[in-house]
Amino acid sequence: MINLKIGDKAPDFALKDAEGKTVKLSDFKGKKVVLYFYPKDDTSGCTKEACNFRDNLDALKKLNVEVLGVSNDDEASHKKFAEKYSLPFRLLADADKKVSREYRVYELKNMYGKEYYGITRSTFVIDENGKIQQIYYKVKAEEHINEIMAEFKK
């Protein structure tokens, strides 16, 4: 598998959201999409990142931008997370890690000297035609929303 680059066609996928409905990236043709991958529901960094997207969602929607969050958690976990923090955008369950691997964000990580596999916090901005407009890799949860908002104000 090759790493994705700016200008590449974003790989399409079909994943279930918190309500069990199938969501495809191709459903959003004609809109820009912020596709953000995060490690785990209801953990401190992931909660900050999700709440920052929530708090800026109106501004993003005015710019014809959809936000989709993806983690390896299941639909039930996403439902609890979304309800707890009033997250108005879709969280998608990549429990089999297929999409995370395809986007090259599921990889070997190291925390406190312990190695494990998981999602590296990353975001793909996808244009109206399904092409990758920008890639943010290994982002800082607290500050990432500023990068995203700046991307759409160019």
Q: What spans do the regions from the language model cover?
A:
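Chalcogenol-based redox active-site neighborhoods
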Residues: M1-K154
